[in-house]
Amino acid sequence: MNPDLIRTVQMGPWQHKVDDGLDARKTAYETMYTLIDTCLSKLELQAFLDRVVAGLIDTSDEIKVICHMMLFRLSQLAPVAVTQKLDDATPHLDKTMKGATMTKDTVKQDLERAAELQRSAVRAVVALSKVGGGVSPKFDALVDELKRNPTWSADFKESTV
């Protein structure tokens, strides 16, 4: 993310941040997702996974969802490479599962978007747990926490079937 591409726009009494680089980043991550199916054998997987993990901390929820989908797909196609990056990805997945801070002004659309992002993260964690169980203590703690959490345990069990 390039902070030079973020500008603040005045809309009446409110200020709104506009990310002029979002479309380019989104296209780049969608292209990366396509590369997984078209030329995985030609990719330098560790560098590729570094970019996927970097996408997990992007400010855009859309990019995070694409990265969750990439982790899901890579856990099936390149499990060894993915397990090597579990320690790097776990804090970002955990932060997503903790959710955004909600205030009294939070609108229903924002709540739904946050819930969809968390469901996407659960799907990624379930896929990663199938290949990375026991490899990373941090990741195992996240999996246990999700299984015990009343909000996410049903989604977790549903995704493991």
Write out the residue ranges for each language-model feature:
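Hydrophobic residues within the alpha-helices of tandem HEAT/HEAT-like
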Residues: 31-37, 55-56, 67-81, 93-97, ...
